Regions:
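Short boundary/linker motifs that mark transitions into or out of structured domains
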Residues: 1-32, 84-93
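Short acidic, hydrophobic short linear motifs in intrinsically disordered regions
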Residues: 47-56
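Intrinsically disordered, charged and Pro/Gly-enriched terminal/linker segments
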Residues: 25-32, 39-45, 58-68, 72, ...
């Protein structure tokens, strides 16, 4: 029996599909093969109706004969993957082997574990989980494909996941201390840059700078946060960042 753990799907960054250790994505049909397969994979384990697949591939202007075009696409995709990977006719399901690894799924699971570990103060476990999530979410989902609403929804979800992963990674590095403080600062700076309206990024950056003895710079970060939040949202910094700012002033 072939090992399921040799089956891997990479949707972020370079598109890769390996079945039992063998690359098959080069055999995918035309430009539509990638989004069709990706949509089915991201819907797992749900079976997807043909009308939904047409909407996923051609959201604004389905071609004439789109039902036949979808049938041809599915046939070619089955030829590339093997008939057992795409189950069903009226509805279609991606039936990857048990234990198959999909980068997006792995990132979201790793992120959840990292966030749980942060809450529990298990810094090493949080660090590894957040790093795994960052590795995937820092790369674009299906680059080169545009104008697909479902893809934009998933991209926004992964953008949010990247924010969460950066936050968990910075917190884990702070918890570990020592040489990891530099990593905490880099992650916090990246979070502030990526989402300047997220207060936790500023607090983590202030904490890392204070930990390294740069209290004046940490106070400057608070001022930056105050101005951004005031100008963009019309609010003041929340209690967590405000209280840490007061603590720094008392040092």
């Amino acid at each position: 029996m072939e090992r399921a753990d040799n089956t891997y799907v990479q949707l972020c960054g370079r598109f890769v599909v390996e079945l039992h250790g063998r690359r098959v994505d080069q055999r995918f049909p035309s430009r539509q093969g990638r989004p069709l397969f990706a949509y089915l994979v991201l819907q797992r384990p749900r079976a997807v109706g043909r009308d939904e697949l047409v909407e996923a591939l051609w959201p604004s202007d389905p071609p004439a004969g789109h039902a036949a075009a979808l049938t041809v696409l599915l046939s070619k995709l089955r030829a590339a993957l093997g008939a057992d990977i795409l189950e069903g006719r009226g509805t279609v399901r991606a039936a990857l082997p048990p234990g198959a690894r999909i980068d997006v799924e792995q990132a979201l699971v790793s992120l959840h574990r990292a966030q749980s570990a942060v809450v529990q103060g298990e810094w090493a476990r949080a660090w590894s989980g957040a790093l795994c999530a960052r590795y995937v979410t820092e790369r674009p989902l299906l680059p080169g494909l545009e104008d697909l609403p479902w893809l934009e929804v998933w991209r926004r979800r992964l953008e949010d996941a990247l924010d969460d992963a950066l936050e968990a990674y910075a917190a884990a590095c702070l918890g570990l201390g020592g040489t990891e403080i530099a990593g905490a600062e880099r992650a916090a700076r990246r979070l502030v840059e990526h989402n300047p309206l997220r207060e936790t990024g500023y607090k983590l950056l202030m904490q890392t700078l204070a930990e390294r003895g740069n209290v004046a710079e940490a106070l400057g970060v608070y001022e930056r946060a105050r101005i951004v939040l005031r100008d963009e949202l019309g609010i003041s910094p929340g209690p967590a960042i405000h209280d840490f700012h007061a603590e720094l002033l008392g040092r």
